[in-house]
């Protein structure tokens, strides 16, 4: 089962967010609360008033090389498991996500 899925004009991406992390970065897959694989993303921002969500969006935008305005949170506003939509070429985005899932980056 993949952590991403092609949709019209983009992809959806399943995430597992770790707020207030000591080591920030993204990469690798971990099981979510539902047992399905998700891309792990660790941010230093707290899960308070959307700060972690904003940090996640900024980190994803940089890693996927898209403007942050092209990333939309679909599910998980207050949860660690999130589903986001990323607008862009599904093939290019999917390839980048696969690279992140297999290795990842640390900031």
Swiss-Prot record:
Pfam families: DUF167. Gene3D superfamilies: YggU-like (3.30.1200.10). It comes from the Bacteria. Belongs to the UPF0235 family. This is UPF0235 protein GbCGDNIH1_0277.
């Amino acid at each position: 089962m993949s952590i991403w899925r092609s949709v019209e004009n983009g992809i959806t991406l399943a995430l597992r967010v770790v707020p207030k992390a000591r080591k920030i970065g993204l990469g690798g897959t971990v099981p979510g609360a539902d047992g399905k694989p998700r891309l792990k993303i660790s941010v230093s921002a707290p899960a308070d008033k959307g700060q972690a969500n904003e940090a996640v969006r900024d980190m994803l935008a940089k890693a996927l090389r898209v403007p942050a305005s092209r990333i939309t949170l679909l599910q998980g506003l207050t949860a660690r498991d999130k589903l986001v939509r990323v607008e862009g070429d599904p093939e290019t985005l999917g390839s980048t996500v696969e690279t992140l899932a297999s290795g990842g980056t640390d900031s």
